[in-house]
């Protein structure tokens, strides 16, 4: 039986690593920045009023990422938001390994081009440590979600965690991978 390697991972190893090594004058292949994990987070503030809303968020993130997300719960009660301690407030899925590369490939080639009036994502959302976070306003751009079965529009935050120490190296890595940054 042959071992399957995601196509974006193959492209990273064969094409992108040599380009980054020459661009940043890196001698050791292990110093080249790579992606560690991708965190997909969806906050569900209305779950305080209706507990069934969190089930829809769990099913959507499960379909999109291919793994069951963790339910985030409130750490403390906040009366103004009618929030009680222990209530579900969101879902988070952390992708690593093959699932991460497959999700990234689907995101870049299928999902982002389906956004209406899409002009690219901002390249100013790096955190100073080489990690990149951006938000999507609806889950319907993913092919896994059936448009007729959407009960409500849910946005999500996607964080790409890299081994890069600087934003410039991370920006170069993500640009080479195919992230459509605004010019």
Swiss-Prot record:
Keywords: Ribonucleoprotein, Ribosomal protein, RNA-binding, rRNA-binding, tRNA-binding. It comes from the Bacteria. Pfam families: Ribosomal_L5, Ribosomal_L5_C. InterPro entries: Ribosomal_uL5, Ribosomal_uL5_bac-type, Ribosomal_uL5_C, Ribosomal_uL5_dom_sf, Ribosomal_uL5_N. GO terms for molecular function: rRNA binding; structural constituent of ribosome; tRNA binding. GO terms for biological process: translation. SUPFAM superfamilies: RL5-like (SSF55282). GO terms for cellular component: ribonucleoprotein complex; ribosome. Part of the 50S ribosomal subunit; part of the 5S rRNA/L5/L18/L25 subcomplex. Contacts the 5S rRNA and the P site tRNA. Forms a bridge to the 30S subunit in the 70S ribosome. NCBIfam families: PRK00010.1. This is one of the proteins that bind and probably mediate the attachment of the 5S RNA into the large ribosomal subunit, where it forms part of the central protuberance. In the 70S ribosome it contacts protein S13 of the 30S subunit (bridge B1b), connecting the 2 subunits; this bridge is implicated in subunit movement. Contacts the P site tRNA; the 5S rRNA and some of its associated proteins might help stabilize positioning of ribosome-bound tRNAs. Belongs to the universal ribosomal protein uL5 family. This is Large ribosomal subunit protein uL5. The gene is rplE.
């Amino acid at each position: 039986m042959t071992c399957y390697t995601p196509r974006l991972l193959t492209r990273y190893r064969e094409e992108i690593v040599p380009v980054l090594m020459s661009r940043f004058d890196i001698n050791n292949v292990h110093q080249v920045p790579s992606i560690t994990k991708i965190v997909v987070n969806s906050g569900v503030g209305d779950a305080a009023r209706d507990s069934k809303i969190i089930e829809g968020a769990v099913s959507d993130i499960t379909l999109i990422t291919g793994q069951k997300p963790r339910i985030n719960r409130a750490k403390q009660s906040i009366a103004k938001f009618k929030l009680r301690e222990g209530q579900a407030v969101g879902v988070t899925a952390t992708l690593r390994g093959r699932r991460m590369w497959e999700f990234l490939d689907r995101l870049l080639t299928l999902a982002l081009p389906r956004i209406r009036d899409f002009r690219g994502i901002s390249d100013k959302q790096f955190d100073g440590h080489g990690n990149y976070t951006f938000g999507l306003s609806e889950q319907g751009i993913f092919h896994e979600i059936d448009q007729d079965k959407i009960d409500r529009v849910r946005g999500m935050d996607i964080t790409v965690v890299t081994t890069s120490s600087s934003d410039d190296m991370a920006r170069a890595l993500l640009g080479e991978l195919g992230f459509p940054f605004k010019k």
